[in-house]
């Protein structure tokens, strides 16, 4: 079991964002904002809630694992044979927030999914930053 876990890979994206954690949290948890930078979904920040991200190519089945408002959010991510966990961590800094996104659970035989996530999450986090900047109704 320990060997299997050691073989799993993780995609990590980190950014310093010039907004408070509350504003970033809003973009991570409000479906109308999630749709702008990630995908449409029926997400709600409630532990054990099952939800689906929907894209033109298919869907991603998810379940909320952890919710610490304005600090951390974690959910499963299941699509096309990939069973992984996405974790968002928000740490306040003097200039805003340090955002860290990790997707853990890529097996060695899932190279295409791993590389796709490496590229895709970077793009999604860039879009997330744009949505945060444009969200005038937030903190």
Where are these regions (language model features)?
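Hydrophobic ligand-binding cavity/cleft-lining segments
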Residues: 1-42
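A generic structural micro-feature
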Residues: 5-9, 56, 80-82, 113
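A conserved amphipathic terminal alpha-helix motif
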Residues: 105-139
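Hydrophobic-ligand binding "helix-grip"
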Residues: 39-43, 52-100, 104-107
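Residues at helix-coil transition
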Residues: 29-30, 39, 69, 126, ...
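Hydrophobic pocket/interface hotspot
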Residues: 24, 34, 51, 64, ...
């Amino acid at each position: 079991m320990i060997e299997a876990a050691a073989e799993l890979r993780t995609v990590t994206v980190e950014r310093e964002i010039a907004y408070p954690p509350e504003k970033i949290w809003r973009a991570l948890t409000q479906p109308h904002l999630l749709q702008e930078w990630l995908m449409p979904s029926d997400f709600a920040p409630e532990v054990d809630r099952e939800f689906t991200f929907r894209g033109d190519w298919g869907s991603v089945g998810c379940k909320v694992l952890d919710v610490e408002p304005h600090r951390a959010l974690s959910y499963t991510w299941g699509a096309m044979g990939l069973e992984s966990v996405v974790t968002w961590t928000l740490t306040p800094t003097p200039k805003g927030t340090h955002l860290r996104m990790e997707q853990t659970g890529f097996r060695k035989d899932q190279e295409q999914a791993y590389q796709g996530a490496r590229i895709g999450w970077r793009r999604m986090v860039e879009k997330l930053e744009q949505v945060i900047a444009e969200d005038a109704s937030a903190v």
